[in-house]
Amino acid sequence: MAYGWWRRRRRRWRRWRRRPWRRRWRTRRRRPARRRGRRRNVRRRRRGGRWRRRYRRWKRKGRRRKKAKIIIRQWQPNYRRRCNIVGYIPVLICGENTVSRNYATHSDDTNYPGPFGGGMTTDKFTLRILYGEYKRFMNYWTASNEDLDLCRYLGVNLYFFRHPDVDFIIKINTMPPFLDTELTAPSIHPGMLALDKRARWIPSLKSRPGKKHYIKIRVGAPKMFTDKWYPQTDLCDMVLLTVYATAADMQYPFGSPLTDSVVVNFQVLQSMYDEKISILPDEKIQRQNLLTSISNYIPFYNTTQTIAQLKPFVDAGNAISGTTTTTWGSLLNTTKFTTTTTTTYTYPGTTNTTVTFITANDSWYRGTVYNQNIKDVAKKAAELYSKATKAVLGNTFTTEDYTLGYHGGLYSSIWLSPGRSYFETPGAYTDIKYNPFTDRGEGNMLWIDWLSKKNMNYDKVQSKCLISDLPLWAAAYGYVEFCAKSTGDQNIHMNARLLIRSPFTDPQLLVHTDPTKGFVPYSLNFGNGKMPGGSSNVPIRMRAKWYPTLLHQQEVLEALAQSGPFAYHADIKKVSLGMKYRFKWIWGGNPVRQQVVRNPCKETHSSGNRVPRSLQIVDPKYNSPELTFHTWDFKRGLFGPKAIQRMQQQPTTTDIFSAGRKRPRRDTEVYHSSQEGEQKESLLFPPVKLLRRVPPWEDSQQEESGSQSSEEETQTVSQQLKQQLQQQRILGVKLRLLFNQVQKIQQNQDINPTLLPRGGDLASLFQIAP
């Protein structure tokens, strides 16, 4: 047969091989070649008619190279079990006009009716939080941790599900410390987060169709975390990662299409309120003088709020002048616009500034709608409603002050409502206009003052939560929630007020002669005498204490936050960002072998594999080596006395259901400086100072003789004993914690202090006194 006819087909190209620089896996770095000296001379000789090169072969003297690193190995427990914690959570839920709120702080709220949640979040994840989600039926564990007191953390896979209409931006942080500062919330604003190279966009299905409906992100262990076996109690409160997320708008990044301008408008109190802003009872006389000055200024009554606040009081026959009852018609100005006679009024809060109005009732030509008799009605209405509130609430209402009343007080809608009969005759406020794209942040200041503060100036001690040199649209993002966490007051929206200083508004919110002067803004609904959201149902207690607080200033912060670039404009009633997580753990330990024997002839049900497997999950807080039986505790078929004594100290669980935490566990902690911590502790209990050892070159009697003698005279013996007992108790607690930390270090179970929660590191043990 002609086998030569079928010749082998030649390759027209070389055989494919992988290029070394295109390998899938990274190769190990090659050790550099040893440098050799100059080549020796070669002696050649002719043999057999041909020349042959000849070398002198020397024996190379080698040297053993030392290892640069050694591998430290750790013996693993006898029993190991992999566990995946899989669950679903809403990263954030944003209701209508709640863009500037922090969802992590409001995730457990029960307020209804009204919008829920917030447009940004600062979530953290710990093993305790994962167990809490398991108790809420929000996740499942693939393996039980019962009797396995050791654990290893391997990382997590996150799956973010894309929304049909709304875009999101997320940022995952694994670098400790996992604490909030005054710059955390502003950095999560979409305008700031869009410039972060570590941020990840979660586009909506409308913005990017045709792609997967989820985005997967693999996250490793935290930085500076050593991968080894730890007791579950040590990793229970260690922060594994934090997720920063915010709603954004990629289709309309520079303003909503439903508005015709990007300029924000709001109102601030005029300078007449500067020294009368406090609500303390000892400032009541100054408030009464200011209220009299405001109520005597007749042009302030040129608004429809005068009818809403005073007409029901007059129609009920409560306005009595002498023996006659005043009617509403007798309060109106009946002078026709046929004369040019004028009337001069002294502007409230001043003694020399006068304003001229015509005597006629045409408000379009600087006339007054009401006559001089209206100025007494507001005060009478405020006094009557204040006494009625006292009678209704009884002893539970102790602060009766008509100057802070709803109908005719200092902050009544009669003086502060922006809707005037003529726009050129405003009330006791100033209209402010703000363009977010002209704000450079230089000179901006945002802080809060307690309601008892007597002025509007910034004070380093009394003022709190200062954010400076940032654009107002970024500083307003998540500001109220940061103030609540920083001060520790969960009711701060009723106990503090917001102040703003900015040179980028029109007119400028600053005083050049007083750089610390601030201005108090308020929302449109507060000026109209309504609750946030536009509801007219004002509670009776709030009607007796009607003054600007953070509750009535939140809408101003909301408008400022929504004016920034890429901000979500709350065009939908409610949006949410869903997330699936898969935390990877390994449980380990040396448990006692338990043999469970069941009756093979009796089965309660026969359902095959359709019934989900039930797992016994133990709280990691109590799953410690001290509260677990091990193989070495079991000898000769019995448990040892030490093991039984150790297990008897196990705390028992109570069946009392608590009302829940005031703040969700998923919300991140806030960073406190040492000075702020000392101030807080001094408010809670008297300071306890450690005795300082006096060097031999100092004379302690000369330095402390005066102070000690005065203190000993004022304090009794019992007070000194109580203070010493308190000092000894605190020192005992600190020493026990210190010995516990030293023992963990000796057992190679120590964790980096930056990964521990606040107060769990060694540095916090010595913060007793300066």
From Swiss-Prot:
Homology family: Belongs to the anelloviridae capsid protein family.
Region ranges (Disordered): 645-682, 697-717
Protein name: Probable capsid and replication-associated protein
Keyword Cell cycle attached: no
UniProt feature, compositional bias: Polar residues: 646-656
Predominant place of localization: virion
Disulfide bond sites: none
Gene Ontology CC entries for this record: T=1 icosahedral viral capsid
Record-linked InterPro entries: TTvirus_Unk (IPR004219)
Positions with biased composition (Basic and acidic residues): 666-681
Function comment: May self assemble to form an icosahedral capsid. Presumably essential to initiate and monitor viral genome replication by a rolling circle mechanism.
Record field: compositional bias (Low complexity): 703-717
Entry keyword Ribonucleoprotein: no
A Pfam family annotated for this UniProt entry: TT_ORF1
GO biological process, any: DNA replication
UniProt keywords, alphabetically: Capsid protein, DNA replication, T=1 icosahedral capsid protein, Virion
Compartments where located: Virion
